[in-house]
């Protein structure tokens, strides 16, 4: 199967996708995407991709600027640790990006998509952000 990936230049396609991301973790995930053979799963992902395209065509693309992986800092804070200033700024930036994406989706609420469940998991927290 890897021979097929090579002839399709999958690595180059995934690198182009990774270059379009705004977060290092998203770039790493994009570079590791594997083709799927489950028809139902592929159809669902294609519907999500189509819905994302339609939303961006109608309402513009949301900004993910400031999104960083703050998992380690949040775990340490949850365990009672103290965050330093760069960590606090990273958390604030991520919260700001979440609020921005959530606000963007609210502008397009009238359009139902296969992505709705993903947007519904976003929980902006302006108080904590500031």
Question: What are these regions, as identified by a protein language model?
Answer:
Residues 1-130:
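Conserved amphipathic alpha-helical "coupling/scaffold" segments
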